[in-house]
């Protein structure tokens, strides 16, 4: 026969399990509703002005992060069953940036210039949007729930600000693995800026090959970056900062920008303060290490 304290432990476990099941049920219901909203609005062009009644009844609320639970990191070498184009020419950008699609010509009026690799919950995207209103900015995120959160966040922001100058039509997110498929999305020299904000440090030495900055990957980043384009990195892990600096310094197509340049660059300030991870580091009084590198001309072009 169980002792009284054992009975209490069993009850506590049952209560905890029941609460977890109830919480998961709420999350599932919430996400189902958001999924319907996402399907309805993610391809909307917002060309026809809604009636006052539609505007009032069809407002979309910002998503709540607690309903998008996800592990902090994801294994980039796993088979995530991701969708990706065979080449940049096969990519359908209209579904991500409907506001920049010309119905008459059936062509995009602009192409993606800025990429936030591992965009997390989209804090950097939303802050960059008003700074570069005519540039398309893409967030790439491998985690399912986090990607859906950012999708819902962008949909809500577009809905809320559709009649304003800053309407967030220039930002989007897709679920993708930049370590494997980056050249499938972007043409040679297409990007002007790439951000790597608080990437997974992969502390164990045997995991270092999974870090987002390696010699091989830097060559791919150099391929999609235009001459003079900038790689932005920030982390709260000094060892990872030193690792990224070492590999960028060793690569012949990147040159570090000065501290004076960093202090004057608007994107550095936004990157330092706007991401959710960065804000958490600030709250915990942690340190942030920044390094920015310019894409150099190819050697054969330096004649």
UniProtKB/Swiss-Prot annotation:
InterPro entries: SAM-dependent_MTases_sf (IPR029063), Trm8_euk (IPR025763), tRNA_(Gua-N-7)_MeTrfase_Trmb (IPR003358). It is an enzyme of class 2 (transferase). Its EC number is 2.1.1.33. Residues 10-38 have a biased composition (Basic and acidic residues). The active site is at residue 200. It catalyses: guanosine(46) in tRNA + S-adenosyl-L-methionine = N(7)-methylguanosine(46) in tRNA + S-adenosyl-L-homocysteine. Keywords: Methyltransferase, Nucleus, RNA-binding, S-adenosyl-L-methionine, Transferase, tRNA processing, tRNA-binding. One of its GO terms (molecular function) is tRNA (guanine(46)-N7)-methyltransferase activity. One of its GO terms (cellular component) is nucleus. It is found in: Nucleus. Pfam families: Methyltransf_4. It comes from the Eukaryota. S-adenosyl-L-methionine binds at residues 118, 141-142, 177-178, 197, 275-277. Pathway: tRNA modification; N(7)-methylguanine-tRNA biosynthesis. Residues 1-64 are annotated as: Disordered. Its main location: nucleus. SUPFAM superfamilies: S-adenosyl-L-methionine-dependent methyltransferases. Belongs to the class I-like SAM-binding methyltransferase superfamily. TrmB family. Catalyzes the formation of N(7)-methylguanine at position 46 (m7G46) in tRNA. PANTHER family: 3-DEOXY-D-MANNO-OCTULOSONIC-ACID TRANSFERASE/TRNA GUANINE-N 7 - -METHYLTRANSFERASE, TRNA (GUANINE-N(7)-)-METHYLTRANSFERASE. Forms a complex with TRM82. This is tRNA (guanine-N(7)-)-methyltransferase. It comes from Scheffersomyces stipitis (strain ATCC 58785 / CBS 6054 / NBRC 10063 / NRRL Y-11545) (Yeast). The gene is TRM8.
